[in-house]
Amino acid sequence: MPAPILPLIEAAAQWPPTGALIGLDLGTKTIGVAVSDPARRLATGVETILRKTFTTDAARLLALATERKAVGLVLGLPINMDASEGPRAQSTRAFARNLARLTELPIGLWDERLSTAAVERELIANDVSRAKRAKVIDEHAAIFILQGALDRLAVLNRSTGAA
């Protein structure tokens, strides 16, 4: 049975209360990957996958999820500034549907609006060269996406009195 693909808050209800989450920033040429600690407080970068074929990319992502004992996936959804979904969001949803057929890990979709721009500004502010930025931006965007999702879940947990 395919994994559920849900908005972040609904996906969180499917995940156990603790356990690592894998965060993904899906690009046309690369996939940035981040992982949380089991308590879901901190996101750290794992790697940038150079995209080849869906089968190859999915195999690497699921191997990372297994290695990190992940209990769920957070996929950045590139929503337009007017809250509509364009071709990139549709492509991300298609990737999620295909990935869901290969795993039982619930997939949470998280609004990634401006994540790459925010990361690029931060890297520029830290005087990271253009060449180095190109190599690390997708992994850092995955960190940004996953940390945003973790922070949102932490706020919700505090407001509901959960862990």
From Swiss-Prot:
EC nos: 3.1.-.-
Gene3D superfamilies, alphabetized: YqgF/RNase H-like domain
Protein's recorded name: Putative pre-16S rRNA nuclease
Family: Belongs to the YqgF nuclease family.
Keywords, alphabetical: Cytoplasm, Hydrolase, Nuclease, Ribosome biogenesis
Compartments in which it is found: Cytoplasm
Its job: Could be a nuclease involved in processing of the 5'-end of pre-16S rRNA.
Annotated transmembrane regions: none
Any GO BP: rRNA 5'-end processing
Record InterPro entries: RNaseH-like_sf, YqgF, YqgF/RNaseH-like_dom, YqgF/RNaseH-like_dom_sf
Source organism of the structure: Rhodopseudomonas palustris (strain BisA53)
Cited CDD domains: YqgF
SUPFAM superfamilies: Ribonuclease H-like
GO cellular component assignments: cytosol
A GO term, aspect molecular function: nuclease activity
Keyword Cytoplasm: yes
Alphabetized NCBIfam families for the sequence: RNAse_H_YqgF (TIGR00250)
Secretion signal span: none
EC top class, as a word: hydrolase
